[in-house]
Design a protein with these regions (language model features):
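The feature primarily captures lumenal catalytic ectodomains
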Residues: 1-200
């Protein structure tokens, strides 16, 4: 019904994409490239951004990109909207088929723009170069390590230092991965940060 619609004056960029919109990996590889393309490759002025329920860490990163919190439209609270113009972009790299196959074909420009946008924002702190990524605080149960005591012995033997990336600010995560020489851990979204590692 018309009463369900919320009206916005101006142009809205649609960045909603279901549950993956709040996933750390998909945020950097799906959503950030769309914002970059609109801001840097067009003259379109975006007034609002239609997004999946924004998390605190996302709001901070949006701010780095020049997107203010009051410019974000929460798609969970506003399922139907009207605007003068609504823009939706194709996925920047996924075409069709299995995700695992498509991610292997990730365009280099997607990685490079993330490095260009965020490497300069790193916050230096004293950290070790050989690191182990601990997923024990993850809200997801997959890729968890069950024999942690045995793994801890191995970690000590290999002179690795344990880090929980989600306990660090985004800026410190950039620095941690940028200075790392060895990174070990179970598969998880934190490995997205390898885009900030030094080449080689």
């Amino acid at each position: 019904t018309p009463s369900m619609f919320k009206r916005y004056s101006g142009t809205v960029l649609n960045l909603a994409q279901g549950a993956s919109g709040n996933n750390y990996f998909h945020f950097f590889f799906d959503i950030i490239p769309k914002i970059y393309l609109i801001k840097k490759k067009t003259r379109i002025k975006i007034d609002f951004y239609y997004v999946s329920t924004p998390k605190k860490w996302q709001i901070k990163i949006f701010k780095i990109l020049g997107v203010l919190e009051d410019e974000l439209i929460n798609s969970s609270k506003n399922k139907h909207i009207f605007a003068d113009q609504i823009i939706s972009l194709d996925h920047p790299w996924y075409q069709k088929g299995m995700f695992q196959d498509q991610v292997r074909k990730m365009p280099k420009w997607v990685i490079l723009i993330n490095r260009k946008l965020f490497l300069k924002k790193k916050s230096k702190f004293k950290c070790f170069k050989k690191i182990f990524l601990d997923r024990s605080s993850s809200s997801y149960n997959h890729c968890q390590i069950f024999d942690q005591k045995k793994i801890n012995k191995w970690i000590i033997k290999k002179d690795l230092t344990i880090y929980k990336p989600e306990k660090l600010s985004f800026n410190k995560q950039i620095h941690l991965f940028n200075t790392a020489s060895v990174i070990v851990g179970a598969h998880g979204a934190a490995f997205t940060n390898i885009i900030f590692c030094k080449p080689g």
